[in-house]
Amino acid sequence: MLEVASARDRDWAGALVRDNMAEAYRRHGLAWDPARFAADWAGGENYLLRCDGGAVGYLRLLRHAGRSYLQDLQVVAERRGLGLGTQALEQAKALVRGRGEAALRLKVFADSPAVRLYRRHGFVELLNEPPLIGMECRLP
């Protein structure tokens, strides 16, 4: 279940994103930028994914120009493959739909395994900006 993250959760969430994205960043010649994460945290809607009483993931939504973007969806390594990412994604879509918005957008590395998850949940490719692709899910 998603719950609103507090300021004290920022370091944990940042470490999760940094660790989960390390291989993709290395592959694409990028470096982790803690200042960028802090700025994104400050400008976004931050949620922890909780299961069995503990934090097992992190999700951030960003509103820009009247649209909502899924900026981060991370699950701790030992809890992947259990449907937690799906659960968080569906809750994020419900949050955005509840605001009366018609779509949720995101950008993801084109070679990320997450692309399959997003496609299974109705996201389609809108643009190709290597190494990223932009995707959108229309919300009924």
Indicate where each model-derived feature is located.
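Conserved beta-strand-loop-alpha-helix junction that forms the acyl-donor binding cleft
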Residues: A77-R80, R105-V115, P131-R138
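Conserved GNAT-fold acetyl-CoA-binding loop/helix
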Residues: R8, G14-W41
